[in-house]
Structure formats: C-alpha cells, structure tokens
Amino acid sequence: MAMLSYDEAIHIANVQYTLVKSQNIVPFLDMALRFPEYAKENICLLMVQDPEEVTEFRTQREWLECGTHLLPDVRPITLALFKSQSILYVFDVSQTDQQRSLLPPNAEKAYHALIQTLGQEPVELEESKNRVAYYDLTEKQWYVNLKSNHSARFRSIAAILVSKLLEKETGIDAIVTTDMVVYMLCKKYGISPEGINLKAMQDSLRRITDTAIADNSIRMAMHCMTIHPLRDLDAYYQGQIKQLEMERKQQAEQEALQAEQQKQAEEKR
C-alpha cells in the first residue's frame, strides 16, 4: 500500500487536532505521522480531557490485531490508557481510509486479541459504523456513543477549547458566548452547526436580563475569533508541525551523538 507523504498526512489531519487542546497536540500529531494510513479525521476520536495524560499507544501491529467482531467489514481500533482515570478507551477507526488496500484483521483473531488486552469479556457492542466505545475498568462495562459523526466531533471539541478560553472571564454568559463562537467556527470551516442556530442564540440573548452581560457576551464572542489559536487554526496547526519537526530533529541529533560517543568509548576499551 502506498504510504501517504508527510505533507499529505499533515493536510488530512487539518484543524481537528488543533481543536483538541491548544497547549499540547504533539501526541495526536505523533500518532498521525507514525500511522499515516489511519491518520485521517478519526485521529480526532482521541478527544481526551488532556492529551498529556496519554501514557501508551499500541504498536501498529497490535493496533491491527485489535478489532471488533461485530461488523462484517471489521476495522482496526486503537487503545489508550489514561493516568487519572481507570478507563480503557477504545476508538473505532472504521471511517478512516476507506480506499486503503490493507485488508482488515481477521475478526475472530481481533476479538480474542481485544479480550486478551482487556483481561475479560466485554458486553456486546451495538452495531454502528460511527461507533466510539470505551470500557470502564471500574464498572466493568462497555459504553458506546453512536453519535460520533464528523460534525458532532468538531462542535464538541470546539466547545471544549472555547470553554477553556472563557473559564476565567467574568461579566459574560459563558454558555451563550461559547455557542456563538462554536457557531462562527462551524460556519468558517464549513461544518454543520446543527443544534446551534441564529434564532436559538437570539433567544438565549433575550433571556439574559442584564443588558451589559448580553453585550459583553457578544463582544467576547467576536474577540475570541480574533485571538490565538481561533484566529487562524490552520496557521496555528502548521506552527505545531514545525515545532514537532524541530523537536524530532534535535532528538535525532542527540541520539546520533550519544551513539557515536558510546561507539568511541567501546573502541577505547
């Protein structure tokens, strides 16, 4: 199978990585670059509260071996563990590169690999090509979100980012302001603003009895669209890529230097 180029992997990732968390998206970029054939929109399924809490990603081989047994066109899933929660998330990548020539893993083998990873039998998952599932190790129960389409994920991640930007602001209605910003982001990037429309926002503003708070909410929403990183998500994303490239280059140079020093030390013995 033809591997995607670096630029193609970057392009298909698009703004969705950026919206996950403004401070650190390196784990997501790293996943995209290590497994570019799976790096399309569904990498954003790794929508966690804090990307820095990701402690482990499975290897590509393990990734391929872990799948779901329910669908006839079974696709791989990926597992990630988090420090602060006793939860093992399972992300369905069934909507990833539909044109890829790579065959899906054997369903029975994939199912047993998943059971081995979890350490016990999960309850039956609901059938859905838009599935995002996770297994709660405390409750020992599978949970499935069937409404994980692209637009819903974009709106959800955008709302998380905007909420973080507004959490220290006073004199505004944070919920209304968030809705306004998410609506504008959706319109800007061609995402369906389903559930957030102009009439609903107008009604919400009318329900604010304090006119100063209503006015401040509108001004803050407009201001949010002018500040980093919402001002230009694509430019922000490219900046993160350059930073990642620089870090990787420095790491490679450091490893090469250490290897050379070790070689010289061994030759002197």
Report each predicted region and the residues it spans.
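N-terminal accessory/interface modules of nucleic-acid-binding and processing proteins
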Residues: 1-269
